[in-house]
Amino acid sequence: MTDNQKNIIGTILLNMSASTIPVTEEMISNLVDINDSMNARMYGTPQMTPEERQEVINALHAALFVRIDRGHYVKENNHTPWYMAAKAENSSKFWDRYRLYLLKEKHWNGDTINELDKTTDEIMDLLGNPDQADGFMRRGLCIGDVQSGKTSTYIGLINKAADAHYRVIILLTGTIEKLRRQTQQRMDEGFIGLDSYALTLKKGHVQVGVGAIDPTTSGWAVTSTSSDFNAATAQKVVGQLSKISAPVIFVLKKNKSVLEKLEHWLRLYNIDPVTQKIDLPMLLIDDEADNASVNTKADDVTAINKGIRKLLVLFGRANYVGFTATPYANVFIDPDSEEEMLKHDLFPRDFIYALEAPDNYIGARNIFGEDAPYGYMLESSDDCEYALPMVHKKEDSLQFIPESLKEALAAFFITNAVRDLRGDQKAHRTMMINISRFIAVQNQITKVVDSFVRDWKREIRNYYLTGSEALQYDSFSFIKKVYDKYFKQFASNPNFARLKHFTWEQIQEVLYPAISRIEVRAINGGNAPKNLDYERYEKAPDDIGLRLIAVGGLSLSRGLTLEGLCTS
């Protein structure tokens, strides 16, 4: 998407965020044309092509017709509300620039941001008051659907915590370094406002994300997109926390050594020798809170759980807030050990907040639930059992490509062609294959799938411009069959009326350019930072996104974001 397109989308969303007039198709179309003409007149930018204009209209549709309702929560009764009174007195500079960032850069609509505003207000009010003199230890849990916006919620919460005078923020990601780096990058863009890599190396202030909106406000990064916590770096960048006026954030893996190093550094340089506490209010957010954080042994505190607790007790005023889509381990902690009875573990004793998903979210209940609106997509298939049984050993291998996997590959090919036809060439597209937890089996599957994809690519390259004659070849006839079975019906489906649909002939004409860049990679054994290198493709001269078939197991199961995930 060009800068002109982004500016038009951002301007329209910003103006409409304060409007109460109902949005219509005609209004969107007129506003796009007015802004396009104005930019051409005032700044000399070329007017949009019909394809670019349609891309802008599609983006505005996606933003303006989505809303999120507020969530629901349960809490203990002794907590005193404090946040709304504090909010009226405090500056809201961190939240204000995050709000503008969501509007102008992420193209959220005003209603959705307003609901996020209300939701984060409610969660803030469930935390302790950072300005109170008395100490506190609050523990809570936020529950949301998979990939439904939990990250945006806790980034919003962190911005509001900074406005409310929280001085130390610790954000725990999963156990994988790639996930930590992804989360750090989002914090750079959504809260810190600076490139943390340049900041920790003292190479100057490079504005990113919210920093481009208001460079006068920033969080202080101790970790970066290149490095987890390091005591030497922390001492060089921060020194003593009490001497830093900006809120300081640590983005950490859930790793025993990392947690111990941070605890040791905090204790050595920041603790009050009299109270044996750090007298700064702290918010600890535990993303994927059911992963590695919960105690799994009766009277033996597990390493990660112990590390988190040791961080919490360092601070006189502290909050622990877990975020998860699978809360069972957290909610059903059995306080049957002496340790849990004495220290309460990380059980969310103070509140549980259930986040609502956006109304355009399609999750498990929309497909598998009773009377599910998308249940018609379900098909029963067990052909993979003959190729690689669900219960298998690390010595086993994928014997052949089952029909269902071939259909999934064909669907991914078609999806790439459709997105190119819609003008989304710059968008990343990913397909996930997760059918074994054994690395040896995953690597073998990668080779088999890669060989199959290369054969299809070769045939498509040779014949995609031969019209209907191409259908005599296996790859074309199979992909056309998948198009007829799964894609053709959407043209007449009212749920997809706003989308632009394409005939098989149109898809075939662009099929090879769309799929020629597809790569098959194994994601395992710590190679995710190298193999999920979306950032490198964003900086490439042709600005074409990564098109990837990711084969993996446990590494793909825990929080890693697969950009543009189309097919699983």
Per-segment meaning from a language model:
Residues 151-165:
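Walker A/P-loop NTP-binding motif
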Residues 167-206, 437:
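Conserved Walker A/P-loop ATP-binding site and its immediately adjacent core
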Residues 196-229, 275-289, 424-549:
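Conserved C-terminal RecA-like helicase domain
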Residues 198-210, 280-286, 295-419, 430, ...:
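Conserved P-loop NTPase catalytic core
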Residues 220-280, 293-311, 552-553:
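Conserved RecA-like ASCE ATPase "motif II neighborhood" in helicase/translocase motors
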